[in-house]
């Protein structure tokens, strides 16, 4: 939760901060175009490091984030945006791959929802606070945010340090149980993760930018993003209930319906009130999709003893195609194309999710497992 406080102050507003500090949307787009593929690449490049020192990387991942925060106080240039992208992607990879691996071995579907709820609660207040701070005197307020954020990241590592022994034992156990799985059944999950990555980046990155350029202030964007977190909390509780009742596909159906309505609405209207409603609707759709599908993926990789490779490639696929989403902006400076793609992607996600959750052949087949030698 403490980490979520800090993330809400920097990660949520990073493209907006670059845009406002430079008064140039292209700098924000350059950052995003570099950030997404770098995340996919670093997942694969740092695979062995994450495999051996996963718990340590979770503890130290905030270091590049703190560097970014103080670099933000310099004059923004295109090459500085590339440095931001490299440091932010490094922090992303150092944290989420090992964390998801711990989930795959120690957690169950109920705890996926609980973790998401804690994250949403952590973001809620600080998104509003950051939006109002940055909406005032930008130069001084940015320094306040960066210093506060640095302190929070340091504090967030303390609980992990206290539980280091237990976490390391669980992590090493997960890595040792991992194997390389030779099966075509992961193709559906790979496709789903590409589609999910596109949806996620529209919700978490493009939506705040879209709201801001539609004449909404920093404060207004912050309020909308906070409302989205409130909606996510409720949706996580509902998703947890539906998954427990073995109604995962119903959760996905509700998610896809909300997603489709939201994208269609944003393409039709730019009315501020309707943007609030459609944004919240889009926020509701995220947990209702994430919780059942992530739980299904965990069940799959645990069954196949494919913990580490499964999680590593999951993250790589999620980030693999995101960079292409920003290319249309260089031709036409608007986000209409991204919302059209989101609308189409909603239907694709629904179809892929249906195939995964109802793949009877996959449930029955014996999967060939090839042991992987783990480097000591």
For the regions a language model picked out, list residue spans one by one:
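Helix-loop boundary and gating motifs at the non-cytosolic
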Residues: 1-40, 183-226
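Transmembrane alpha-helix termini and helix-breaking/packing motifs in multi-pass membrane transporters
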Residues: 15-21, 125-146, 209-213, 323-342
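Structural signature of the two symmetry-related core transmembrane helices
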Residues: 56-71, 250-265
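Cytoplasmic helix-loop-helix junction between adjacent transmembrane helices
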Residues: 88-119
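Juxtamembrane intracellular "pre-TM" segments in multi-pass secondary transporters
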Residues: 163-195
